[in-house]
A protein has these predicted regions:
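Active-site mouth loops of central-metabolism enzymes
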Residues: 20-28
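Mid-to-C-terminal alpha-helical segments outside catalytic/metal-binding sites
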Residues: 40, 154-208
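Catalytic pocket-lining loop regions of alpha/beta-barrel enzymes
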Residues: 11, 27-129, 188, 196-204
Length: 208
């Protein structure tokens, strides 16, 4: 195994995936690359962070090629998360059937993100995680502050708290309960996170 696999900071493979929104991308090449990345993750039992932007059908097809079809002989469950999920109900259930969890970040804090917010309100505990995608996907408060010239749009890891508050509100629970649910789901999807969360802040820092 490569030495990097022994580093507790290495918790999975990603972000990998397909993007059907950005113009000029070689989609055939992207699919070939993702296919090989999925094979690496399967063979090395690595969790995945998967980018899916207007490419759910193609992504699900590649997952079936590599991991098999859920409920069928030979199927291997997939660990990891679908980053910034914004798909249909059918796509939601399809990704969950593989064993993946769905990620929600800054977009869930916007009142206009109706479908995203509904997904987050309906999903069972253990099926969703929180993320920031720093420095992208700013939460609503940062966007509003930016409009007033009081902040940048650069998202920071601490902004996950705003997503957690939104999750609690949408799910009708407390902030502590929502945070605990998201934390447990994240550790289940990326088991080495539990090791990383126990490390002292000074771990890995170079000394003068």
């Amino acid at each position: 195994a490569l030495p990097i696999f022994d580093d507790p900071h290495f918790i999975g493979l990603g972000e990998v995936g397909l993007d059907g929104f950005e113009p000029g991308l070689d989609q055939h090449k992207a699919e070939r690359v993702l296919l090989e990345e999925l094979k690496i993750a399967r063979d090395l039992d690595l969790p995945l962070s998967i980018h899916v932007r207007r490419t759910a059908s193609k992504t699900l097809g590649l997952l079936r090629r590599v991991y098999g079809s859920p409920g069928k002989t030979g199927f291997q469950p997939v660990r990891g998360a679908v980053h910034a999920f914004n798909g249909s109900d059918a796509e939601r259930e399809a990704f969950l059937s593989f064993g993946l969890v769905l990620g929600f970040g800054g977009a869930c804090t916007y009142d206009g993100s109706k479908r995203i917010r509904r997904h987050l309100s309906e999903l069972a505990d253990g099926a969703w995680v929180l993320e920031t995608d720093a420095p992208d996907m700013p939460p609503a408060s940062r966007r509003d502050a930016f409009a007033l010239g009081q902040s940048t749009l650069d998202t920071r890891p601490a902004d996950i708290l705003e997503a957690a508050r939104t999750a609690a509100q949408l799910r009708g629970t407390t902030l502590a309960a929502a945070a605990a649910s998201a934390r447990a789901a994240a550790i289940a999807a990326f088991p080495r996170l539990e090791i990383l969360l126990r490390l002292p802040e000074s771990f890995g820092q170079q000394t003068e």
